[in-house]
Curated annotation (Swiss-Prot):
Gene3D superfamilies: Farnesyl Diphosphate Synthase, Terpene synthase, N-terminal domain. A motif (DDXXD motif) lies at residues 307-311. Its cofactor is Mg(2+). It catalyses: (2E,6E)-farnesyl diphosphate = (1S,8aR)-delta-cadinene + diphosphate. GO terms for molecular function: (+)-delta-cadinene synthase activity; magnesium ion binding. The Asp-Asp-Xaa-Xaa-Asp/Glu (DDXXD/E) motif is important for the catalytic activity, presumably through binding to Mg(2+). Binds 3 Mg(2+) ions per subunit. Mg(2+) 1 binds at residues 307, 311. This is (+)-delta-cadinene synthase isozyme XC14. Responsible for the cyclization of trans,trans-farnesyl diphosphate (FPP) to (+)-delta cadinene. Residues 1-16 have a biased composition (Low complexity). GO terms for biological process: diterpenoid biosynthetic process; response to fungus.
Length: 554
């Protein structure tokens, strides 16, 4: 989350004789203004709620009803998931897939069915073997030329390949094979298959944000001739109901943010509370996580302010007491801070105090201590980076990586995301998370390395900041593009680790693991074409507009 800088004008309210030459990050103001300050003056009417409930029960019956073959069952479950309503039917879908896993009819398994079955089962943790794809290869070990004409089968194989783990060479080959042939075929396809293929080549199902993907698929699914009218109507109503809830949450958060008045008090910092909410709604969008969403959005907003304080304004001498104050976590420390640091320090403590009050009624105060400790570790790693910048120190790549991974904040966000969850989260969950398990490591690597490539490639970094890409280039004598390729390989490897951690038996319930999966997905969506959070790229603008502004036409 580093930035380009310019010199802060001496007329700035924060400048003084001592520090009038401080750098100031040249961030654009929020593009949303006060748009989300007020919630739309409407509620879901009783008739719509009744219809929603009626359709929900009809869809539930369809999921568990016998169908002519497993292909139909798999396709229906896939539609339920891709339309964003599977959270209503978790047990029913799990039971149906368990049955399919144990009762495979090989006669049905063309490329489409084999790939769809593989993807859905892997998504739900069933360790189905990638050997099921061997029958689509010839004696030379290449994919048969006959499958290239099966575009729908190729599309499903492409999507399935993103569930691969380490050692699954056939799926590594499948990514290249399907990408090549789908790219060649897309121009000659008819709608809506052409749209499915072109969208998939930009964003796979596995790495896309479920609600963003659901919004897109709603517009495609209704044009598929064989679509299920009951499911489509239910998904549209459900989308709008959840959107209204999200707008109410964002309105509440926007008022909190406006009251803090950081735009005036801390002009060096990013004003990205809307983008922060979009980020966190990617971590969990479902209605039952409303409390968690609001708490975690406030945390990411404050983490962004703290990051900018370390990275874009404060002197190293000021950061020492600031870090100590965060470590001590005591409002009495505020008197030891420079005047401009006091508002952010107080606001940080207030966010966690509110968090404690909200979870106290369920006896979950212990969770907030883990969240505080995660924030403290984040601040400590920021201080290390600040010291390196002050000393113009060039660490080795491994030394840089050891400190840079914590500074991306993903371990902190993962741990804090558990605070607002239900009884599925226990003290053991936090002990597990605090020990840096593989899935949190993997999502952190995805975050850090995608951020590093984006910052360097799109020149979103201060010249005096330590750059992971430049550390690597200098140490190994490679070009920038060669360094990008190495970092991208680390990202691909981390995705395989994420996938592996979902295969049963798992260390933690899927509901817990999903938080790290979704954090990784946010990076894939927001950072593939630059820092989409700081510089609010096309993905962020489009996602916020489609999820929070425009309802689905019924």
């Amino acid at each position: 989350m580093a930035s380009q800088v310019s010199q802060m004008p001496s007329s700035s309210p924060l400048s003084s004789n001592k520090d009038e030459m401080r750098p100031k990050a040249d961030f654009q103001p929020s593009i949303w203004g006060d748009l989300f300050l007020n919630c739309p003056d409407k509620n879901i009417d009783a008739e719509t709620e009744k219809r929603h409930q009626q359709l929900k029960e009809e869809v539930r019956k369809m999921i568990v009803a016998p169908m002519a073959n497993s292909t139909q069952k798999l396709a229906f479950i896939d539609s339920v998931q891709r339309l964003g309503v599977s959270y209503h039917f978790t047990k029913e879908i799990e039971d149906e897939l368990e049955n399919i896993y144990h009762n495979n009819n090989d006669a049905e398994n063309d490329l489409y069915t084999t790939s769809l079955r593989f993807r859905l089962l892997r998504e739900h943790g069933f360790n189905v073997s990638c050997d099921v794809f061997n029958k689509f290869k010839d004696e030379q070990g290449n994919f048969k030329s006959s499958v290239t004409s099966d575009v729908r089968g190729l599309l499903e194989l492409y999507q399935a390949s993103y569930l691969r783990v380490h050692g699954e060479d056939i799926l590594d080959e499948a990514i290249s094979f399907t990408t090549n042939h789908l790219s060649l075929a897309v121009a000659s396809l008819d709608y809506p298959l052409s749209e499915e293929v072109s969208h998939a080549l930009k964003q796979s199902i596995r790495r896309g944000l479920p609600r963003v993907e659901a919004r897109h698929y709603l517009s495609v699914y209704q044009d598929i001739e064989s679509h299920n009218k009951v499911l489509l109507e239910f998904a549209k109503i459900d989308f709008n109901m959840v959107q209204l809830l999200h707008r109410k949450e964002l309105s509440e958060i926007s008022r909190w943010w406006k009251d803090l008045d950081f735009q005036r008090k801390l002009p060096y910092a990013r004003d990205r509370v809307v983008e922060g909410y979009f980020w966190i709604s990617g971590v969990y969008f479902e209605p039952q996580y409303s409390l968690g969403r609001k708490m975690l959005t406030k945390v990411i907003a404050m983490a962004s302010i703290v990051d900018d304080t370390y990275d874009s304004y404060a002197t190293y001498e000021e950061l020492i007491p600031y870090t100590k104050a965060i470590e001590r976590w005591d409002i009495k420390c505020i008197d030891e801070l420079p005047e401009y640091m006091k508002p952010s320090y107080k606001a940080l403590l207030d966010v966690y105090e509110e968090m404690e009050q909200l979870v106290a009624k369920h006896g979950r105060q212990y969770r907030v201590e883990y969240a505080k400790n995660a924030m403290i570790r984040l601040a400590q790693s920021y201080l290390v980076e600040a010291r390196w910048t002050l000393q113009n120190y060039k660490p080795s790549f491994e030394e840089f990586k050891a400190n840079a991974l914590p500074t991306c904040g993903y371990a902190m966000l993962a741990i804090t995301s558990f605070v607002g969850m239900g009884d599925i989260v226990t003290p053991e969950t936090f002990k597990w998370a605090a020990n840096d398990p593989k899935i949190i490591q993997a999502s952190t690597i995805i975050c850090r390395f995608m951020d590093d490539v984006a910052e360097h490639k799109f020149k979103h970094r201060r010249e005096d900041d330590c750059s992971a890409i430049e550390c690597y280039m200098e140490e190994y004598g490679v070009t920038a593009q060669e360094a990008y390729d190495v970092f991208n390989k680390h990202v691909e490897s981390a995705w395989k680790d994420v996938n592996k951690e979902f295969l049963k038996p798992t260390e933690m319930p899927t509901e817990v693991l999903n938080r790290s999966l979704n954090l990784a997905r946010v990076m894939d969506v927001l950072y593939r074409e630059g820092d989409g959070y700081t510089y609010v790229g096309k993905a962020a603008k489009g996602g916020i507009t489609s999820l929070l502004i425009e309802p689905v036409a019924l």
